[in-house]
């Protein structure tokens, strides 16, 4: 049996590790459920099912384009379109690093961000989540935001592409 600690020590074991998991275990991991389906009172987007037999850790997911979105106090950063209006890629990166620092403090492993959709209509209700109508600029800013998260130890899950 290959454990998670063995995979961390030797990443080449990842395929064999996944290959030993049952369809049920894989499905439970894919839907972000812990001890059943759904979310708990903390407000996170989900948790990956822990398999004690294999030593898999708990991964906590939260939305977070503009901060760590939980049912508790958090830092609210400027919306993505505001950050993008500066054309400052370093600012997008630093926003990601700051969100990562708060995520780690709140024991969140994965931030469901950045949102990388494009502005297609000025009346779009979710435009504040997206960086720009320009695909190149949106990609640069979203990429730097995500890199800031990941360089500081929090996984980034780009969405709304």
Stretches with model-predicted labels:
Residues 1-161:
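Glycoside hydrolase catalytic-domain context in secreted enzymes
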């Amino acid at each position: 049996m290959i454990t998670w600690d063995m995979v961390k020590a030797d990443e080449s074991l990842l395929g064999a590790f996944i290959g030993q998991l049952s369809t049920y275990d894989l499905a439970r991991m894919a839907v972000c459920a812990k001890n059943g389906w759904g979310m708990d009172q903390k407000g996170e987007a989900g948790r990956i099912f822990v398999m004690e037999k294999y030593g898999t850790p708990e991964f906590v997911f939260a939305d977070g384009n503009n901060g760590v979105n939980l049912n508790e106090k958090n830092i609210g950063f400027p919306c993505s379109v505001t950050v993008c209006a500066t054309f400052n890629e370093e600012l997008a990166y630093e926003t990601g690093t700051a969100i990562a620092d708060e995520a780690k403090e709140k024991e969140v492993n994965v931030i469901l961000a950045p949102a990388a959709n494009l502005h297609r209509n000025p009346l779009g209700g979710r435009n504040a989540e997206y960086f720009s109508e320009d695909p190149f600029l949106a990609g640069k800013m979203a990429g730097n935001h995500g890199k800031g998260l990941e360089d500081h130890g929090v996984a980034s899950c780009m969405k709304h592409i």
